Structure formats: C-alpha cells, structure tokens
Amino acid sequence: MQSTAIVFQQPKSLALTGLSLPEMGAADVKVEVEFSGISTGTERLLWDGTMPAFPGMGYPLVPGYETVGRVVDAGDQATLKVGTRVYIPGSQCFQEAKNLFGGSASKLVVPSARALPIQESLAEQGVLFALAATAYHAHSAPGTKQPDLIVGHGVLGRMIARLAVLAGGHPVVWDTNPARRSGAVGYEVIDPSTDTRKNYKCICDVSGVSSLLDELIGRLAPGGEVVLAGFYDTPLSFVFPPAFMREARIRVAAQWSPPDLAAVIALAGDGLLSLDGLITHRQDATQADAAYRTAFGDADCLKMVLDWRQVT
C-alpha cells in the first residue's frame, strides 16, 4: 500500500512523496485523511531547522499531528467501524522517513486506539484538538489556577482563554499585533504596553518568546505563578531578586495527555467548547509548499488547514 505524504527533506524544503504503508495488524485501522493542520509551534521549528536536538530527530521526516480522516478498513480486533470520522494525533507508520510526527499524509495505518472518534459535524475543525488538549492540560490538573493573564492571542492563546471563561474566569490577553486582538468572546485582548497591572495571580505565556520572563515576573502578585505553555527554542533566564521578592512560581506545561484529548473532544461534542473562528486559511494538500510558507510567514494566518480529499 502507498500513501502520499508531505516530507521535509531538509529545513525549508518539502515534497509530496509516495511512501509505503505497513500491512494492517488485527487491531489496526486504515484511514483516508481528509484534513490536516499545520502547527506554528513545533512544526515551524522542524520546518526552519531550529528544533533543539532530541532522540529520533532528523531528516527526511513526515510532519503533522493534527489529522482528521475516515476509517476505510479495520482489522478483526479493531475497536472502530468502517466509516467512522476520527482524529489522529500523529502516526508511526512510515519506514522511509522519520515520523515527526507522521500525520500529514493521504492515508495512514494506525492502532485503532490511536484514532479517536469525533462528531461528524466538526469536519476540518477536528484538526484543532491537539491545541485544545494542550490548552486544557495547562490548567486542568488538581490545584492549578486558571490564568488571569494570557500572553499571545494565536490559536493556543484563544483556546486557553475560552477554557478559562468556561471555567468561570475573566482573563486578560496580551498581543502586540493589532490584527490579532479581534475575535475575543468573554474576555479582553489588549496591547501589553497599555497594561499597568502588577498583581496577576497566574500568567500563562504561549508566545514562545524566551526573553519575556523578567517582564512577566514583574507583573505577578506575591505568590503568583508564570506558566510556560509555549515552546522555546532558546534558553530562558530571569533576574532573581524580583522573583525572590514575589516568591514567584514558574511552571512548565508540557504536551497533552490522552485524558486531556478525551476531555476536549467531549467538551466540543457537547457544544461547550467552541472551535469557531480559529481556522483562517485553507489550501489543497498538493500546494503544501505554499501553504507552509503562508502558515509561517503571514501574520494574518491563525491556522492553515490542508485538504487531502483530492489526493490519492
């Protein structure tokens, strides 16, 4: 079996390439991909070659962990039926390239447990579940606070704000880009230069800007917390006395876990978590090179979705 996949051959160089799929196991499903999202966080670092080294890192690679498709074949022990629309957070099904994270392809073979059923009506919005789960993970553990300041109004920042409002919060969001200050429902987005507050109890940073830590610590109330929920490609540091005076806490929010993903799928399915207004750009998967350059170079692009429905 063959699949057409996006392959990063090296930084800033990609091609649509035919790759072999493995034979299906008894508990596997074959999925024809309908949509995949382009991540402007980790995937951007893979694209431009600035991803810090980690085990398994290298080129060529198949990117993607935001995939929506439909089950077209299922093994005897698979838990999903043919025809089910699913979300897949990446795959490990390609041998001719590294799977980082292996979801941007026309067809995938994955364990049925890795393909999560989603509401039929969500369609392309299903690609947003990885970001939604990341947002949920940052502030859902027992004892964690909802943020009263969120730094960055991209898709992840908007997800965190929507979840905070859903939990009864009233967050403020910073964004330096005037074009990114629209789209708020139930919270306020402001230019950080106009904010004089220095009593935030919980600040969640999703900007990925390593140099902001001193500024954020200076905005904390005593005993306040900075949550680092972005991805940072350069070292972070901070001046100690202001953090000491506030007895500041710094917490790293890593990627989501399976319960986080299940939680946001349920919230969206119940109509509690809106995914509207977050996908701004769409491109046929055959135009992937142009799509990636738009996703990473156009400040007006919140989320780019690739349409695979015409790709074999």
Please identify what each model-predicted range represents:
Residues 35, 89, 204-206, 308:
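Short, well-ordered coil/turn residues at beta-beta hairpins
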